[in-house]
């Protein structure tokens, strides 16, 4: 019998006391090491992690998890790493498939299917179906390079072997994602700000044409190519929000290019307010004199 190499599980957290127990319960029976990297939670996340035997490390809050995830992977002891979000879990079917995958010698990096629950229901389309949303989650540390860029986190090194798994064969990570549209829009707004700042730092420039093209592509891809029209009202509204997300990135990038920051706008408004109020100067004295 070939013994599988040990696996380190990495989970990043920020106020995840509701979700984290499910994630930890799904990995504690097979993970050889659990590393929880917490971004200074205000709830009982850290206590829950330690109660389940996890090694806890800390990282500053960045507005998104990717920089902390890179740090957490650096804290692991083992070569094989499985990355899990705090609002995800690993079903038994997937857990049972892991030993065969890493001892089979077919790949150094695996893209694992993910079943997404959004707005209260599991999705099979929209680009968020299990086989549409395969994530790079199981890998040898030596086979990937890691960047802090949002949504562009892992990069497979040249020469590393990559394999995309199918949900019919191994199951899928279960992801309990956005609760409602309010939750969804709040996240999109935050992510759009981060993406705009990173694009600006790279020297990218916005244009109305680019915004229109990106928004239209999102519609065509999610609603038609990836079957969003089959998801009823969820498909329609989620596609609309994602299309608006692309527009928002370019809008926020335009603000950065023009120096139209919050501080600058507040300064401008204050100056305008003072200009209007200057019209009252002397009127109070005149009123009293009369």
What are these regions (language model features)?
Residues 32, 46-75:
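Conserved donor nucleotide-binding strand/loop of the catalytic core
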Residues 66-73, 82, 91-260, 268:
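Catalytic-site signature of metal-activated, phosphate-bearing donor transferases
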Residues 18-21, 43-52, 93-94:
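Acidic helix N-cap motif at the loop->helix transition within catalytic regions
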Residues 260-290:
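Alpha-helical transmembrane segments and their immediate juxtamembrane flanks
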Residues 6, 32-33:
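Residues at the starts of beta-strands that form the adenosine-phosphate
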Residues 26, 30, 38-47, 61, ...:
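A conserved acidic beta->alpha catalytic loop
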Residues 1-26:
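N-proximal low-complexity "stem/linker" segments adjacent to membrane-targeting elements
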Residues 39, 60-61, 78, 85-88, ...:
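Short acidic donor-binding/metal-coordinating loop in glycosyltransferase active sites
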């Amino acid at each position: 019998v070939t013994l599988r190499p040990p696996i380190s599980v990495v989970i990043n957290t920020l106020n995840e006391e509701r979700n984290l127990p499910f994630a930890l319960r799904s990995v504690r029976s097979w993970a050889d090491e659990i590393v929880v990297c917490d971004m200074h939670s205000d709830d009982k996340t850290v206590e829950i992690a330690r109660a389940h035997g996890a090694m806890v490390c800390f990282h500053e809050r960045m507005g998104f998890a990717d920089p902390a995830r890179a740090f957490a992977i650096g804290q692991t002891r083992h070569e094989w790493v499985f990355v899990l979000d705090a609002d995800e879990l690993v079903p038994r079917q997937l857990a049972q498939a892991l030993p065969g995958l890493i001892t089979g010698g077919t790949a150094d990096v695996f893209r694992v299917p993910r079943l997404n629950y959004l707005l209260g229901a599991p999705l099979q389309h929209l680009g968020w179906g299990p086989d549409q949303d395969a994530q790079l989650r199981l890998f040898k540390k030596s086979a990937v390079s890691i960047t802090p860029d949002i949504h562009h986190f892992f990069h497979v090194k040249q020469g590393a072997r990559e394999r995309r798994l199918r949900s019919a064969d191994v199951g899928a990570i279960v992801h309990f994602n956005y609760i409602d549209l309010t939750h969804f829009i709040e996240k999109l707004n935050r992510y759009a700000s981060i993406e705009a700042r990173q694009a600006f730092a790279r020297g990218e420039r916005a244009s109305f044409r680019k915004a229109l093209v990106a928004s239209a592509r999102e519609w065509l891809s999610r609603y038609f190519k990836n079957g969003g029209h089959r998801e009823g009202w969820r498909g329609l509204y989620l596609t609309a929000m994602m299309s608006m997300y692309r527009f928002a990135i370019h809008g926020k990038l335009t603000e950065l290019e023009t120096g139209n920051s919050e501080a600058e706008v507040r300064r401008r408004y204050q100056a305008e307010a003072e200009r209007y109020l200057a019209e009252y100067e002397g009127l109070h004295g005149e009123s009293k004199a009369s």
